[in-house]
């Protein structure tokens, strides 16, 4: 699966994955979704984001969950 909307650039957000180089970290978008912010609200609050950005951020998170393990006890 090729993700074209997720960019990683050492000069943008210290190399954290971002949405299309917009200095909007994928983690921030996922955090908004995790706290119950709806897609429609995210798109209204951040008009430069597109529905496809949200979809691809979720795909990225799913790929990470397949390959990474996080110590939940910390």
Regions found by a protein language model. Name each.
Residues 40-44, 48-74:
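C-terminal structural segments of small proteins and small subunits
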